[in-house]
């Protein structure tokens, strides 16, 4: 028996490794099983070159458990005592030291912690044994033992077969790794696509009402996964079946891309376009990154463009540096090339489907839309490609490219200033009457009800020359697309004031909602009353909900316009009735206000051109007094009109109809509206 010290400076490397990688203990199994697979593949390579002429036999890597140990066994090339000294005592542990020194401050950011190799065994084991025999003729089998301290022993032993057994004596605080279900889950996670068969226990079958073991090895992996095969060998059903294996609970994918490139980098894989639900965040982390068929991570930010993290599938590349921090990836030339390549393949695939099967593309657009829009918003080079096949959908369910839609609306939806107006709705049911009014004018209305449509609208307004997007309920129909200068309602200022006051006085108090009452000339057949909301303010508030740094707009009240149609007979009736009913009460108030206004004008004219200090104090006091009296008389006038309006059912009914149309009539107010409607009938 030989004893010795491992050439490391650390007194006891085992607790340091354990503490350093506390959250990733499970990767020891990936490292040791992939090492066993490597040893087996090396033997196959030697045999193919004629450097190994012995029998190959069963090359299955086996993982087994007993009460205290986990054993990983292979029939690969094995090790001699000299090779153990070189590869285990020197290289492996010096590699451990280097790794710890370099990454101790950023442990959890290391991509997959790949390259930990053999020494990861000490993350879970208090003692590790290697029993190994080289493939070379007449090689002596040896046993190496270490408890994680710098001391080890190595001795000759008997071993009938070539290869290695790695025996881990599991530490007391890692007993979970002695549970069959835990190891089975880890092997499925990390090793399900390794290129050499990996066996864990025996297959089980139901017999006499219970599961019993058979004599057949339980192979946990597919050694020839779909992405390693040539696309010409595969059918659509193969891709769909593989997708269901990866994501058993997912809907069938829309389509897929098979990646296969070996220059200037190595990359294989299959990326699927899923049916993307409304919540983008729930879609992330579904791409699995492999390195030579060994699972690394499902967190691929930095390796693929952000919008492509919405895809599902597998990418496999030995050229992505895995023992580095994620921030390093962004500057790695190979990673940049891979990211650009994947993005180009995605856009090329979408372009091809659009070009070759427009009907299929349109059928899948509603599921693809959020993905393509996300890419266009975040990647300028993707936008340059995607704007040729990205679609706009109108409220009739028809689809148009950007260019097609511009041609469709340019004659009828260009305003007096030469701006092309894109009308849109984000809720066809709630905005039905506005849509109907716009269609009656011959306008086309887009449906923009997606999660990213607010951001898309803002971007497209910047991309499209002399173009503006306007929601169909943001103004009265005559002003949505202004063809000529707007004509004000033919009313005297006093009549406007009466209408404004009687309707304003009966508007409900709604939290964080404010109304501006205005009078327009909308024609006898136009609606008597409607509620609109400024496109700018509403959009700013919508952006505040999805974009950081815009909370100011989110805190502001919702501003609405209550628009009265001065041409409608009901509004005319209210105006006439208010004037007649309030005449006696208003005459003295209006007379007094007229006198006060005249005197105010006289004083203001007398003070024109004078410096403040040159105006007599008596005049200043009189002007202030007049302003207060005018305010008091205005309050009296509004009180008279408010009292009248309070008893006018037509005013209440019109306001409630407008609120109801905009989904703003709820609770007691809705109940009162129903009762009043029955009474009026």
What are the functions of these language-model segments?
Residues 110, 128-151, 171-175, 181-681:
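GHKL/Bergerat-fold ATPase module in large chromosome/replication-associated machines
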Residues 1-172, 176-177, 185, 587-591, ...:
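GHKL (Bergerat-fold) ATPase N-terminal catalytic module, capturing the glycine-rich phosphate-binding loop
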């Amino acid at each position: 028996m030989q004893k010795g010290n491992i050439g490391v400076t650390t007194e006891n490397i085992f607790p340091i490794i354990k503490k350093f990688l506390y959250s990733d203990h499970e990767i020891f199994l990936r490292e040791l099983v992939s090492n066993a697979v490597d040893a087996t593949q090396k033997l196959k390579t030697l045999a193919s070159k004629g450097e190994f002429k012995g029998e190959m036999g069963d090359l299955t890597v086996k993982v087994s458990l007993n009460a205290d140990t986990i054993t990983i066994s292979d029939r690969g090339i094995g090790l001699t005592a000299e090779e153990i000294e070189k590869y285990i005592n020197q290289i492996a542990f010096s590699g451990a030291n280097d790794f710890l020194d370099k990454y101790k401050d950023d442990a959890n950011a290391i991509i997959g912690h790949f390259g930990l190799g053999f020494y990861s065994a000490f993350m879970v084991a208090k003692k590790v044994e290697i029993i190994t025999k080289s493939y070379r003729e007449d090689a002596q089998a040896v046993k190496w033992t270490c408890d994680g301290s710098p001391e080890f022993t190595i001795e000759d032993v008997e071993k009938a077969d070539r290869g290695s057994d790695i025996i881990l004596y599991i530490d007391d605080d890692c007993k979970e790794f002695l549970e069959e279900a835990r190891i089975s889950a880890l092997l499925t996670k990390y090793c399900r696509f390794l290129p050499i068969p990996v066996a864990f226990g025996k297959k089980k079958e139901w017999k006499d009402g219970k599961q019993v073991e058979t004599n057949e090895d339980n192979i946990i992996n597919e050694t020839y996964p779909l992405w390693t095969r040539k696309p010409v060998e595969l059918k659509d059903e193969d891709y769909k079946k593989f997708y269901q294996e990866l994501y058993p609970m997912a809907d069938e994918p829309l389509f897929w891309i098979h990646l296969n490139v070996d220059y200037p980098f190595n990359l294989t894989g299959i990326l699927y376009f899923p049916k993307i639900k409304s919540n983008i965040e729930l879609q992330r982390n579904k791409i699995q990154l492999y390195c030579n068929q060994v699972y690394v991570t499902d967190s691929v930010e930095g390796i693929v463009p952000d919008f492509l993290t919405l895809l599902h599938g597998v990418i496999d590349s030995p050229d992505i540096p895995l023992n580095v921090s994620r921030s390093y990836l962004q500057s790695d030339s190979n990673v940049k090339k891979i990211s650009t390549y994947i993005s180009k393949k995605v856009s090329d695939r979408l372009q091809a489907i659009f070009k070759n099967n427009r009907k299929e593309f349109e059928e899948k657009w509603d599921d693809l839309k959020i993905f393509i829009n996300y890419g266009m918003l975040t990647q300028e080079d993707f936008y340059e490609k995607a704007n040729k096949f990205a679609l706009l959908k109108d409220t009739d369910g028809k689809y148009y490219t950007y260019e097609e839609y511009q041609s469709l609306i340019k004659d009828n939806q260009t305003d007096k200033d030469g701006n092309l107006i894109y009308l849109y709705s984000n809720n066809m049911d709630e905005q039905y009457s506005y849509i109907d009014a716009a269609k009656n004018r011959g306008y086309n209305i887009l449906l923009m009800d997606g999660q990213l449509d607010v951001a898309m609208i803002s971007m497209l307004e910047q991309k499209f020359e002399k173009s503006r997007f306007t929601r169909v309920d943001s103004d009265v129909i005559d002003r949505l697309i202004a063809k000529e200068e707007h004509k004000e309602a033919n009313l005297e200022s006093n009549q406007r004031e009466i209408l404004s006051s009687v309707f304003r006085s009966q508007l409900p108090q709604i939290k964080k909602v404010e109304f501006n009452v205005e009078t327009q000339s909308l024609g006898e057949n136009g609606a008597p009353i409607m509620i609109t909301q400024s496109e700018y303010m509403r959009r700013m508030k919508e952006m505040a909900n999805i974009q950081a740094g815009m909370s100011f707009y989110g805190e502001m009240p919702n501003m609405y316009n209550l628009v009265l149609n001065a041409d409608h007979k009901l509004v005319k009736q209210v105006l006439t009735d208010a004037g007649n009913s309030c005449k006696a009460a208003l005459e003295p108030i209006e007379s007094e206000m007229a006198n006060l206004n005249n005197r105010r004008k006289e004083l203001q004219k007398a003070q024109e051109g004078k410096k403040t200090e040159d105006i007599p104090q008596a005049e200043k006091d009189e002007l202030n007094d007049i302003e207060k009296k005018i305010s008091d008389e205005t309050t009296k006038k509004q009180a008279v009109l408010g009292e009248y309006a309070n008893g006018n059912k037509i005013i209440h009914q019109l306001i409630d109809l407008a609120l109801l149309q905009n989904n703003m009539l709820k609770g007691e107010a809705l109940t009162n509206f129903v009762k009043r409607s029955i009474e009026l009938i």
